[in-house]
């Protein structure tokens, strides 16, 4: 019986599936670190692309995709990048929703804002921080219009970090493909 090459039965390799879960964990770790522990949100945004690059590269290293094929290399990176990007975006929105709905107006100085818990307190907090003119220029006049603006901006940011992580996944896969091509000298000679 002649040995025949079997076609892959998956769109992505098992190693890429593992890498996708690693990407989920990485996104959660970055999110907890820079949205909760040390709340510096711009760092969270800036790390989306490098996180995607690393996970796209790792998806193919984990799958041992040295030498291609290019379609599979790119799909592995794309899948891992999408998983990382979705987690990145959903975690951002979940943490924003938590703080948006739970804001009771408490301030560091001890004096609370006079407001109803949730959107109204967040709106009053922005007004107290001197953002009234900028909000009015954006058409915000009350808690409801502030809520619409706030969530539109948060969805825009979540989309941005999703796109950055996903594009990073493709970029990482491309870098892996370029730097891990098989060469004739890499072939193993048959043994006698």
Predicted regions and their residues:
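Membrane-interfacial segments
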Residues: 36-41, 63-68, 95-103, 107, ...
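Cytoplasmic membrane-interface segments at the C-terminal ends of transmembrane helices
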Residues: 56-77, 170-188
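Transmembrane alpha-helical insertion/packing segments
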Residues: 1-67
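Hydrophobic, lipid-facing residues on alpha-helical transmembrane segments of integral membrane proteins
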Residues: 16-28, 32, 50, 54, ...
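Functional transmembrane-helix hotspots
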Residues: 91-131
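Low-complexity, intrinsically disordered extramembrane tails and loops of integral membrane proteins
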Residues: 1-10, 182-192
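Individual transmembrane alpha-helix segments
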Residues: 135-167
């Amino acid at each position: 019986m002649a040995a025949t090459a079997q076609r892959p039965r998956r769109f992505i390799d098992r190693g890429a599936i593992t890498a996708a879960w690693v990407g989920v964990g990485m996104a959660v770790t970055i999110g907890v670190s820079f949205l909760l522990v040390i709340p510096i949100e711009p760092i969270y945004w800036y790390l989306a692309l490098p996180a995607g690059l690393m996970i796209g590269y790792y998806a193919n290293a984990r799958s041992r995709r040295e030498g291609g094929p290019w379609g599979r290399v790119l799909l592995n990176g794309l899948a891992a990048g999408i998983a990382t990007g979705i987690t990145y975006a959903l975690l951002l929105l979940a943490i924003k929703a938590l703080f948006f709905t739970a804001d009771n107006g408490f301030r560091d100085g001890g004096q609370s804002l006079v407001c109803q818990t949730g959107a109204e307190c967040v709106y009053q907090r922005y007004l107290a921080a001197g953002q009234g003119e900028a909000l009015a220029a954006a058409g915000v006049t009350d808690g409801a219009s502030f809520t619409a603006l706030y969530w539109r901006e948060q969805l825009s940011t979540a989309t941005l970090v999703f796109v950055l992580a996903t594009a990073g996944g493709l970029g990482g896969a491309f870098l892996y493909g370029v730097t891990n091509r098989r060469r004739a000298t890499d072939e193993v000679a048959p043994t006698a």
